[in-house]
Amino acid sequence: MEWSLAEDDALAYSPLFLPNFRPFPMRVYLTGFMASGKSTVGPEAAARLGQPFLDLDRLITAHAGRSIPALFAEEGEARFRELERDLLRRTATTDDLVVALGGGALLDDANRAFAKEHGLVLYLEAPVDTLLGRVTGDDTRRPLLEDDTGTRLPRDEQRTRIEAMLDERRPAYEAAHHTLDADRPVEEVVGRIVEVVTAQAEPA
């Protein structure tokens, strides 16, 4: 199945445009741990920048025809990562795009190199307490915080797992072009994203 911006319902289009210029072709990739706010601030930042927004995990579920937990359970993480790699590379066919990446997407060296070569990578950084509060405050299925039966782990075990995964992933996240404080109100994080992107896009 061919992928395009016009056809995929995982994309949200932005009605607003910067008043004085269009940035040179730029893809913005938002990375960070689960619950760092990528899918929350991404659409608002895209609207401010006049760019489409794409949530890579939602695109994966659209192509797989099932939820990510179901994909993990039925076909395994390897299949999920295969789709993730393929769909990430297809983003290079579209200019001026804000993409929220899955929390583990840039652990793959090739994915990380691709995103840095083809766009501006922004790491949304938040402390463990903030991440834990966010994941325990919603009912989103998060396979990495569940036991083998699909039951959410107790809070203390979730903290331990988040700390361990953050330690493992931090070098990949910190390879981003910029690190932004995501432990702030949404509007502040959005504003900071817009500042960084427009500063990068303006001609020297």
Swiss-Prot record:
Cysteine disulfide links: none
Annotated compartments: Cytoplasm
Positions that bind ATP: 35-40, 142
Main location per the UniProt record: cytoplasm
One annotated Gene Ontology cellular component of this protein: cytosol
Catalytic activity: shikimate + ATP = 3-phosphoshikimate + ADP + H(+)
EC numbers for this chain: 2.7.1.71
Pfam families per UniProt: SKI
PROSITE patterns reported in the protein's UniProt record: SHIKIMATE_KINASE
Record key words, sorted: Amino-acid biosynthesis, Aromatic amino acid biosynthesis, ATP-binding, Cytoplasm, Kinase, Magnesium, Metal-binding, Nucleotide-binding, Transferase
Cofactor(s) this protein cannot do without: Mg(2+)
CDD domains per UniProt: SK (cd00464)
Pathway(s) served: Metabolic intermediate biosynthesis; chorismate biosynthesis; chorismate from D-erythrose 4-phosphate and phosphoenolpyruvate: step 5/7
InterPro entries: P-loop_NTPase, Shikimate/glucono_kinase, Shikimate_kinase/TSH1, Shikimate_kinase_CS
Cofactor binding: number and manner: Binds 1 Mg(2+) ion per subunit.
HAMAP family: Shikimate_kinase
Self-association state and partner proteins as the record states: Monomer.
Role summary: Catalyzes the specific phosphorylation of the 3-hydroxyl group of shikimic acid using ATP as a cosubstrate.
Protein name: Shikimate kinase
Organism: Salinibacter ruber (strain DSM 13855 / M31)
